[in-house]
Design a protein with these regions (language model features):
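Bacterial Sec-dependent N-terminal signal peptides
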Residues: 6-40
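Solvent-exposed, low-complexity, repeat-rich "mucin-like" stalks and linkers
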Residues: 28-95
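Surface-exposed, flexible coil segments in extracellular/virion-facing regions
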Residues: 88-93, 97-110
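Propeptide-to-catalytic entry region of secreted or membrane-anchored zinc metalloproteases
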Residues: 97, 109, 127-260, 269-270, ...
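Surface-exposed, short loops/turns at beta-strand junctions within beta-sandwich domains
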Residues: 109-118
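Append "Rare intracellular matches occur via the same short Y/T/C beta-strand/loop motifs
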Residues: 118-126
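Active-site-proximal segment of zinc-dependent metalloprotease catalytic domains
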Residues: 241-357
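The catalytic-center signature of Zn2+-dependent metalloproteases
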Residues: 323-424
């Protein structure tokens, strides 16, 4: 066994111990911590609650420091507790149990029989050590008797001149795969999220263009930018505004009727990177118009105005009826956002009125105490947890606040950073369906033109 203690030579720094060899035996394990994916579970037999164990051990190690008064170095033996890597724990040593002592196979729990409102208890055990107990509340089965809707999508691929930059193209198969994954995430097809909803929304490539002609390549409209137009965009590596202006200027070719199509523009509009991706991976606006039959306050968190319809003549910015995606992010999900991999499902959800779950400061949360008006999603400070495993503590949150207990969770949500991005929650689905029903600029699904050409 080799233990090394790092000494910070600065006189004001306190000693720091680092254990490099973590091989342990069961009798060295000091405690077991149990965490769950969430605190509520939908009892439909499909949603699953995953449990995760964290095993800690203690060892005596040599710690070296420097006396602040005498400036002399010293060494002493101290006891250190550390998180044991999973591959160092004996196989099968730690198991998760329900409240009547049944072992959870693979650490997951699903149910169709537990009554909504029931609070279940779970714990982990290894040897003679037992973890903390976790409570999971069975929630009401959500209303999911929605009529399935199909949203026709056209990708406008903005290609710069070959003399200016390397050209590019995307296959129809690639675009279909992108939309399929979005549909699967929205419809609870690829997740174990314990609170996943089923939006019953399917995205498909349009097969007819705006003139009613059969498209040679479904859902794909190529726009070859001329040398002069590309030159007019300037030499900056960030061409976000020039591209948006270009789309609006060429609206007859690049903005198809929002009552028939969802427009997505693909372009390498910037080489900048950011972990959030909200300006570098995509450019979009949330919905802004609501039909007068509905109360503007019915969908909180967005600035609304009443409008009976929304047509091409109403478009003042292309982002009112679509969004622009950076090709670099679509091709290589880590290229622009790093380990917070880009997913087309994120701007798609945002386009339909779903809000970001992250927040930067505790004091900026809304009156409901979260960031997105969806009670079954967690708000979190994304700077604290660059991982799918997170907690709800926020920058600026009072420590030990009894009204906001520390809760761990797992990120499945398409709006979470550092997430599996394979799910919408039940409450997010409810909000999305309200937007689809109430917002005229999001009514492309009401027309079958994109699939029939008007025939």
């Amino acid at each position: 066994m080799i233990f090394v203690t790092l000494l910070m030579l600065s006189s004001c720094e306190k000693e720091e111990s680092v254990i490099l060899d973590l091989n342990i035996s069961p009798d060295e394990i000091s405690r077991i911590e149990l965490r769950a994916d969430h605190k509520t579970l939908v009892p439909n037999g499909v949603c699953k609650m995953g449990f995760h164990t964290f095993v800690y051990a203690k060892k005596n190690v040599m710690s070296y420091g420097r006396d602040e008064e005498t400036r002399e170095f010293y060494g002493k033996e101290i006891e250190e507790e550390f998180l044991v890597p999973a591959d160092q724990i004996p196989d099968g040593y730690v198991k998760v149990y329900d409240q009547i002592g049944n072992v959870l196979e693979d650490g997951y729990y699903a149910t169709m029989s537990d009554v909504p409102g029931t609070v279940l208890q779970f714990y982990a055990k290894g040897g003679n050590l037992e973890s903390n107990s976790l409570e999971v509340t069975i929630r009401e089965l959500p209303k999911e008797d929605y009529e399935e809707i199909v949203i026709p999508v056209v990708f406008h691929v903005l290609v710069p001149p070959a003399t200016a930059t390397p050209s590019y193209d995307l296959s129809v198969e690639f675009l279909e795969e992108q939309l399929q994954r979005v549909s699967d995430a929205f419809n609870r097809k690829i997740t174990t999220d314990p609170n996943a909803g089923n939006a019953k929304v399917v995205f498909k490539l349009a097969t007819y263009d705006q003139n009613g002609l059969k498209m040679q390549e479904p859902g794909k409209n190529i726009e070859n930018i001329s040398v002069s137009d590309f030159t007019n965009m300037g030499t900056s590596s960030n061409k976000t505004k020039p591209y948006l202006s270009y789309i609006l200027a060429k609206w007859k070719r690049l903005i198809w009727d929002p009552n028939k199509y969802l427009n997505i523009w693909l372009a390498k509009f910037t080489t900048s990177t950011s972990t959030t991706g909200t300006s570098t991976s995509y450019q979009m606006w949330p919905p802004r118009v609501m039909h007068p039959d509905y109360d503007l306050a019915s969908i909180p968190g967005l600035d609304w105005e009443h409008k009976e319809s929304f047509n091409l003549d109403d478009v003042e910015d292309c982002r009112e009826v679509g969004f622009m995606v950076n090709l670099a992010a679509l091709y290589t999900p880590t290229a622009v956002q790093g380990s917070n991999e880009f997913s087309l499902a994120t701007p798609m959800a945002e386009y339909f009125g779903i809000l970001q779950t992250r927040c930067d400061m505790y004091k900026y949360l809304n009156e409901d105490g979260d960031s997105d008006y969806c009670p079954d999603t967690y708000s979190f400070d994304y700077g604290f947890y660059p991982s799918v495993f997170k907690a709800n503590n926020l920058d600026g949150q009072p420590e030990n606040d009894p009204t906001r207990p520390l809760e761990y969770f797992t990120s499945f949500n398409v709006m979470d950073m550092y997430s599996y991005k394979n799910s919408l929650s039940v409450d997010q689905v409810k909000r999305l369906r309200m937007v689809l029903q109430q917002c005229p600029s999001r009514w492309a699904y009401k027309s079958d033109w994109a699939f029939t050409g008007g025939n």
